[in-house]
């Protein structure tokens, strides 16, 4: 049991949490304007509102212009504060329920985008980690089990996005493995025409290969959680490449999930790396200056020796 507990709560530097806070809270602002951007419009048509399960469970009120406008400005202010790593718990506990409500309203037309799973969970677990107390939060190398638990939750949700997608593909086909051999990508390209996708329509075998690679990758995605070092990096790059291909073929980006892949990245090394580079550059500059002074001294000594010889 202790090994299981240790896996769920690895000791991770607080600096990774600080970087993740800054990036994700700023991304939420982008998300509100680029992806789930019609929440405020839903407040103008309350009669068309169809609450999702969580909204019904918590008996959230029907959105109005006043509610969605308040949500908007509260989220903007709280995200900007949280991104600075000042008052991360207070600001974080404001952002988590506010953005969850924002998403519930925005997706109330029935299209629930599963690419927001990891992002929403990340916003709920980040406030559980205390504020850094040692200098710059982005450089704090203090290792914390609380930080490890938050990071692990985000990682699990990132992977669950793919694995549960594979399960959904099986379930929709009556638990038969027919999805990889279907014409789903062909249908998607026809529905979302794009030059790269249209070129692939002339090579259907490539589409079937891509479907097989995709579903196998989704089923094997949990393996990434146990990989280490470069192997984990390769696993992450595989899925990021998967999204790059989807964007090129279908213009489907999945950015809310992609940005959460940063939970796997050792971002706590960023500041020490820059500091070591700066120190190395300073040492090189000092060495160059010393060499220049030594050359000047040698030139001066040579000139004096010539003058003495001439005398």
Spans of features found by a protein language model:
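Alpha-helical membrane-anchoring segments
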Residues: 1-311
């Amino acid at each position: 049991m202790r090994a299981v507990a240790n896996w769920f709560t690895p000791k991770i530097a607080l600096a990774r949490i600080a970087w993740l806070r800054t990036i994700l809270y700023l991304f939420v602002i982008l998300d509100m304007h680029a992806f789930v951007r019609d929440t405020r419009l839903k407040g103008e048509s309350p009669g068309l509102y169809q609450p999702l399960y969580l909204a019904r469970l918590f008996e959230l009120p029907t959105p109005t212009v006043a509610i969605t406008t308040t949500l908007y400005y509260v989220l903007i202010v709280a995200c900007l504060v949280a991104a600075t790593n000042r008052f991360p718990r207070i600001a974080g506990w404001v952002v988590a329920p506010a953005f969850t409500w924002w998403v519930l309203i925005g997706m109330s037309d029935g299209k629930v985008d599963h690419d927001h799973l990891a992002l929403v969970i990340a916003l709920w677990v980040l406030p559980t980690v205390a504020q850094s107390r040692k200098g710059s939060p982005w450089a704090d190398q203090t290792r914390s089990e609380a930080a490890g638990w938050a990071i692990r939750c985000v990682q699990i949700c990132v992977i669950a996005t793919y694995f549960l997608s594979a399960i959904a593909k099986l379930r929709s086909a009556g638990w038969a493995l027919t999805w990889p051999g279907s014409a789903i990508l062909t249908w998607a390209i026809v529905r979302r025409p794009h030059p790269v996708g249209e070129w692939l329509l002339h090579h259907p075998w490539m589409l079937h290969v891509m479907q097989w690679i995709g579903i196998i990758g989704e089923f094997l995605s949990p393996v990434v959680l146990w990989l280490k070092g470069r192997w984990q990096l390769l696993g992450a790059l595989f899925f990021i490449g998967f999204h790059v291909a989807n964007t090129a073929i279908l213009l489907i980006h999945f950015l809310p999930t992609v940005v959460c892949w940063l939970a796997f990245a050792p971002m706590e090394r960023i500041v020490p790396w820059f500091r070591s580079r700066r120190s190395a550059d300073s040492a090189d500059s000092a060495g160059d200056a010393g060499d220049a002074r030594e050359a000047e001294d040698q030139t001066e000594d040579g000139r004096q020796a010539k003058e003495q010889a001439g005398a």
